[in-house]
A protein has these predicted regions:
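Short alpha-helical transmembrane segments in multi-pass integral membrane proteins
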Residues: 1-68, 109-152
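Alpha-helical transmembrane segments of multipass membrane proteins
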Residues: 33, 77-81, 103-108, 134
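A generic structural signal for well-ordered alpha-helical surface patches
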Residues: 56, 76-79, 95, 107, ...
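Membrane-interface junctions at transmembrane-helix termini in multi-pass inner-membrane proteins
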Residues: 69-97
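A short pocket-lining beta-strand/turn micro-motif at the edge of beta-sheets
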Residues: 88-90, 103-105, 116
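Hydrophobic membrane-spanning alpha-helices of multi-pass integral membrane proteins
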Residues: 98-102
Length: 152
């Protein structure tokens, strides 16, 4: 990203982000299917099958969060793209949004909801982190487009 920006080839940055987003979706769908059908067996790699309560909790967690894997991948994409372009404040702000969302969900649902409710803290955090990242990425790209048009 940084090299392409330095070379003035922002079209490559756009193309890279677009291609990476497709790869994130492809990998996420694969991971969703894997976790949905084999999540219980995957936990057995780390937890004894005799620990049924722990395995059940892990499967519940998997089932609550797997649908948000594309959002998780997108956090890495947009955060690292913005950092590579030289913008550090907004990616850090995304982390703050993530932390606030995680804490808020746990505070709201703990004691009032089940374990499944607490599991929603991660998806809420991932989606919240994207709130400043995605719009800022498109703002930067639009601003760069206008600057490129003035040069031509």
């Amino acid at each position: 990203v940084g090299q392409n920006r330095g070379a003035g080839k922002m079209d490559r940055v756009r193309q890279g982000v677009r291609c990476t987003q497709f790869m994130i979706w492809g990998y996420s769908i694969f991971a969703m299917v894997l976790v949905f059908f084999f999540g219980k067996y995957m936990t057995w790699l780390f937890i004894s099958p005799s620990e049924t309560a722990v395995v059940s909790a892990a499967v519940t967690y998997f089932r609550m969060v797997f649908w948000c894997y594309p959002f998780l991948g997108s956090i890495f994409l947009y955060r690292n793209t913005l950092q590579g372009l030289g913008y550090g404040l907004v990616p850090m702000l995304g982390g703050v949004f993530e932390l606030i969302a995680r804490a808020a969900i746990v505070y709201i649902v703990s004691g009032r909801a089940s374990f499944a409710g607490v599991c929603l803290a991660d998806p809420a955090a991932w989606i919240s982190a994207l709130i400043p990242l995605v719009p800022y990425y498109f703002y930067i790209m639009r601003k760069t487009n206008k600057a490129e048009e003035k040069i031509e």
